[in-house]
Amino acid sequence: MFERISIDASICHGQACIKGTRIPVHQIVSMLANGDTIEGLLRAYPHIEREDINACLEYAATLAEEQVTSIEKVAG
């Protein structure tokens, strides 16, 4: 599903990273949230591509999806 994101226990303590790098997804998302632009990130990290940044955002969005469990289902 996330071809550009990797999770490896031996890299960055198992944090999700841009594949082939040690750049954690949370770092990219945080930088964007703090006002950095995609163009600025591409200049700061010339070895990544726009698609890598988009993959970080997609990954973060997936993690942020709410999982709603009905109380009736839990109570039985």
How would you name each of these model-derived features?
Residues 1-15:
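Basic, low-complexity segments
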Residues 16-18, 23-59:
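Amphipathic, hydrophobic secondary-structure cores in small proteins
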Residues 48-76:
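C-terminal structural segments of small proteins and small subunits
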